[in-house]
Amino acid sequence: MRIVTERLILRPPTLKDAADIVENVNNLKVSRYLALVPYPYSIKDARFFIKLSQKDPHNFGIVLKQTGKIIGMIGLRNLNYFVKRAEVGYWLGEKYWGQGIGTEALRALMKYSFRNLKLVRLQAGTAVENKASANLLKKVGFKKEGLRRKAMRAKSTGKWHDTYSFGLLRSDVKL
């Protein structure tokens, strides 16, 4: 499965992408709010992650068309077809922040989720301190729904974080 936007291709990662993934996520500014990403992050970690990701059809590398390289990841987890809901997760390499890439990737994933998968609800959580992630979610239409205390532990730092819960209904957006 590939999702194509103006500047991006969202596609499953392959073992050839391991070095690009390491280059972008082996950075505490990126990994400090991620529950499952260690720091430092090695090629071995990337290969393990890629092999797991290949079993999940809804986990995508964010590929910059201009270079053909993976610069981040985005995907769905805890997908429940009965209640038509999934959780969104993402990260983006630091040098790509502030360029609208996260917005473009997230909008593409939303469109895929609501149109192709026929989901009714997407949800996301972000560390209270991660204002950029909260702002991204709000920018694309997610609504802040609550606070979960000590709901996430970042693997890279071992630190517990309170998280905000966000939700988005299909009826909230025009696709």
What are these regions (language model features)?
Residues 12-13, 38-40, 57, 67:
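Proline-rich intrinsically disordered, low-complexity coils
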